[in-house]
Curated annotation (Swiss-Prot):
The gene is lepB. It catalyses: Cleavage of hydrophobic, N-terminal signal or leader sequences from secreted and periplasmic proteins. This is Signal peptidase I. It holds the Pfam family Peptidase_S26. The keyword Hydrolase applies.
Length: 204
């Protein structure tokens, strides 16, 4: 009995904190690894993000969503809210007929206008067939944001209770243009903080 009391005295607080952390991870937070280039340049392949669960979903949040027809979580940006009409015309976003800026796209849109991202897709991380494929997609596109048929002008009406999610690298992202809108229950949390790699640690 004394041995058990001594154990609790020495390790009880540590075990309590460990238990609380484990419970908080189940209910309040998680982490996710970015896979692929769909969120370039905001988030890079292999980065690890801290995700907070049960937050209200707001426009332009970066969220983690679960694909119903797949078995993986994806990281995308919220563009369309329930009931919205989303329209793109030659890289301009209109939300319910109001033109809306997307400053997080400015860098890649400039690169697209400069050389259709050929230099970007020839750099580190785009070696081999992947780079060749990405360059061919970019060459074919007449705008940075196009639909699945490469139309530069297109629109979506977001159903009530659902959200339109797009990647920041519109040319290579598989998102709501391909799989449709996402129900609220399929959005598992909001990415709030990048903690890996150390050189890129911080908010975004």
């Amino acid at each position: 009995m004394n041995l058990f009391k001594n154990f609790l005295k020495e390790w009880g607080l540590f075990l309590l904190i460990l238990s609380l952390l484990a419970l908080s991870r189940i209910f309040f937070w998680s982490n996710v690894r970015v896979e692929g280039h769909s969120m370039d340049p905001t988030l890079a392949d292999g980065e690890i993000l801290f995700v907070v669960k049960h937050l209200p979903i707001d426009r332009f949040d970066i969220v983690v969503a679960h694909e119903e027809d797949g078995n993986k979580d994806i990281v995308k940006r919220v563009i369309g809210m329930p009931g919205d009409t989303i329209r793109y015309e030659n890289d301009k976003l209109y939300i319910n007929d109001k033109e809306t800026d997307e400053p997080y796209l400015a860098d890649y849109i400039k690169r697209f206008k400069d050389d259709k991202l050929q230099s970007t897709y020839s750099g580190k991380g785009f070696e081999g067939n992947k780079g060749t494929f990405f360059r061919s997609i970019a060459q074919k596109a007449q705008a940075f944001t196009v639909d699945v048929n490469y139309n530069t002008n297109f629109s979506f009406t977001v159903p009530e209770g659902e959200y339109l999610l797009l990647g920041d690298d519109r040319l290579v992202s598989s998102d709501s243009r391909h799989v449709g809108t996402f129900k609220a229950k399929d959005i598992t949390g909001e990415a709030k903080f990048r903690f890996w790699p150390i050189t890129r640690i911080g908010t975004f």
